[in-house]
């Protein structure tokens, strides 16, 4: 396959490009800087894209977007979170819809924040959108693929959970504290964490590319856990105690109340119903297996 990838320098994109290349696929990466071989230039802010490099595409994986937890949620950064997703997705969808030879599939990023805060309710792809800023962002983000769908391109919205990797993401940020024995449950610890290993994130994307799934696809492991369980499992994997709870006000001082309330102290109990029904087999279906694989 010839696969176009945006967000290729991020945690997921880097791993995906590596796997696609190892498997013998041709990969073109969209970048904002001066392109190197195997890359093409784009700028969603001004709507420019190097269409000459997009000929004969079989698939597009669109992962671009500002990091949800990279900054305090000021009004300006919240606008950046929304605009970086809406503009880039609209540009990708509109561009590939206008190609003479259209790709067969667009796999477009989304997040389980789509479902909002739902307590202990089990959520799958049939569950409705929730309320709140992240849910609103996800709804707008997914709607921006409409031009590609109208052009007859198969579109899958991958609603990704907490991606586990020792090299970054939520786990990477927590590891230093836990390695020093300073980790513990966050807030009440009762909030659900719907996680997925980086290996399965990439594996699930490849499964969607090769198959026939369309519409929303939850990219989470089939065994979500409460945050306190996650903390205990991580401490066990590292052979460190997890007796020090992290009160909510600590992260709020560093990251701001809205981000912490919406991301760290609120969770979703999400199940990958579409993937399981389509026959995807998880490499690391349990948290223990994922942490053992990652941390030894």
Regions inferred by a protein language model and the residue ranges of each:
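N-terminal Rossmann NAD(P)H-binding glycine-rich loop of SDR-like oxidoreductase domains
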Residues: 3-23
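Glycine/proline-rich active-site loop of Rossmann-fold NAD(P)-dependent oxidoreductases
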Residues: 139, 151-153, 164-173, 207-217
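Mid/C-terminal beta-alpha module of Rossmann-like enzyme folds, strongest
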Residues: 204, 211-258, 292-295
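Alpha-helical substrate-binding/gating segment
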Residues: 175-183, 191-224
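Conserved beta-loop-beta element that borders a ligand/cofactor-binding pocket
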Residues: 110, 143-166
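C-terminal amphipathic/interface module of NAD(P)-dependent oxidoreductases
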Residues: 262-296
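NAD(P)H-binding glycine-rich loop region in Rossmannoid oxidoreductase-like domains
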Residues: 35, 39-91
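Conserved Rossmann-fold NAD(P)-dependent oxidoreductase catalytic core, especially the SDR/UDP-sugar
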Residues: 90-132
């Amino acid at each position: 396959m010839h696969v176009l990838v945006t967000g290729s320098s991020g945690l997921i994109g880097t791993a995906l490009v590596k796997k696609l290349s190892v498997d013998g696929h041709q990969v073109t990466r969209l970048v904002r800087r001066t392109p190197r071989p195997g890359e093409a230039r784009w700028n969603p802010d001004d709507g420019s894209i190097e269409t000459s490099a997009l000929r004969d595409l079989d698939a597009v994986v669109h992962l671009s977007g500002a990091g949800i937890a990279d900054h305090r949620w000021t009004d300006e950064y919240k606008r950046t979170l929304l605009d970086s997703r809406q503009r880039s997705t609209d540009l990708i969808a509109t561009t590939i819809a206008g190609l003479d030879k259209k790709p067969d599939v667009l796999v477009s990023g989304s997040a389980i924040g789509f479902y909002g805060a739902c307590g202990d309710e089990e959520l799958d792809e049939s569950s409705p959108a929730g309320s709140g800023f992240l849910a609103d962002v996800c709804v707008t983000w997914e709607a921006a693929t409409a031009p590609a769908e109208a052009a007859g391109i198969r579109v899958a919205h991958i609603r990704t959970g907490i991606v586990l990797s020792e090299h970054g993401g939520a786990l990477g940020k927590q590891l230093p504290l836990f390695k020093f024995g300073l980790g513990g449950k966050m807030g009440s610890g009762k909030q659900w964490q719907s996680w997925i290993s980086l290996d399965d994130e990439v594996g699930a994307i490849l499964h969607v590319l090769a198959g026939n799934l369309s519409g929303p696809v939850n990219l989470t492991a089939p065994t979500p856990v409460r945050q306190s369980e996650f903390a205990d499992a991580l401490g066990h994997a590292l052979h460190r105690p997890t007796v020090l709870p992290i009160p909510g006000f600590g992260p709020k001082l560093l990251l701001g109340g809205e981000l912490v309330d919406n991301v760290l102290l609120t969770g979703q109990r999400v199940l990958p119903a579409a993937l399981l029904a389509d026959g995807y087999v998880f490499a690391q279906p349990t948290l223990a297996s994922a942490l053992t694989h990652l941390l030894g």
